[in-house]
């Protein structure tokens, strides 16, 4: 059985979306955001105090992962019959790995600075210049997505893959920051295609329902203010 520790619309949405695409059963453990401050007992499971935490199996063969893009790759690779993986022998394998890593290191990281210094920090610690600079930084890097989907429905391999889930979360985060209108036209159309996927919609519904059932606020993590 898979166990996913998750905050609403945090990075842990990536593996949740993947699980819905793969139609895999999972126990979803909802946490308030940020868990390292509001769910201190979680530190016993993940000393980083961050989500996601994905756990599968039991010791000594237990799988424990804390990186969301790596989870996308792992879930796709361990369920190749679903067609979300790209094999090492495929010509698009390099592009596939590049998009998986770019999704967090290049497209999500700058947005975390925008969130921290524009929303999460108290007013006296907010940094408007950081917000402005890293918003521009993100939008400049998003040109790579615009180029990739200008003449293709998805990022690589001529089909929907785990890379689209990983990058799709970065676009979801940008939506929470009000940046969608600054996407290029191809990226806007691509983002709409991703949102239209039934698994994406199921993931949104699953986190909302689980939050309510477990007594956690359903407010998306990127929208939280101090």
Explain the meaning of each model-derived region.
Residues 207-226:
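Acidic/histidine-enriched, glycine/proline-rich intrinsically disordered or flexible terminal extensions
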Residues 1-129:
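GST-like domain detector, emphasizing the conserved glutathione-binding G-site
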Residues 76, 170-171, 204:
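Active-site-flanking alpha-helical
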């Amino acid at each position: 059985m898979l166990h996913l520790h998750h905050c609403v619309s945090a990075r842990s949405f990536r593996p949740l979306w993947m699980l819905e695409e793969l139609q895999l059963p999972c126990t979803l453990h909802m946490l308030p955001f940020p868990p390292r401050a509001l769910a201190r007992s979680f530190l016993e499971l993940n000393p980083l105090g961050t989500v996601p935490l994905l756990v599968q199996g039991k010791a000594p063969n237990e799988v424990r992962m804390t990186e969301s893009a790596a989870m996308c790759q792992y879930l796709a690779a361990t369920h190749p019959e679903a067609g979300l993986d790209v094999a090492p022998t495929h010509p698009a394998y390099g592009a596939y790995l590049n998009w998986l890593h770019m999704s967090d290191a290049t497209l999500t990281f700058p947005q975390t600075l925008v969130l921290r210094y524009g929303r999460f920090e108290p007013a006296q610690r907010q940094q408007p210049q950081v917000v402005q600079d890293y918003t521009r930084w993100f939008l400049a890097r998003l040109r790579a997505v615009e180029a990739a989907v200008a003449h293709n429905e998805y990022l690589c391999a001529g089909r929907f893959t785990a890379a689209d889930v990983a990058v799709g979360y970065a676009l979801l985060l940008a939506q929470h920051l009000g940046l969608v209108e600054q996407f290029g036209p191809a990226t806007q159309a691509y983002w709409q295609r991703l949102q239209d996927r039934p698994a994406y919609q199921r993931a949104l519904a699953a986190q909302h329902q689980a939050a309510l059932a477990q007594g956690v606020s359903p407010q998306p993590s990127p929208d939280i203010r101090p």
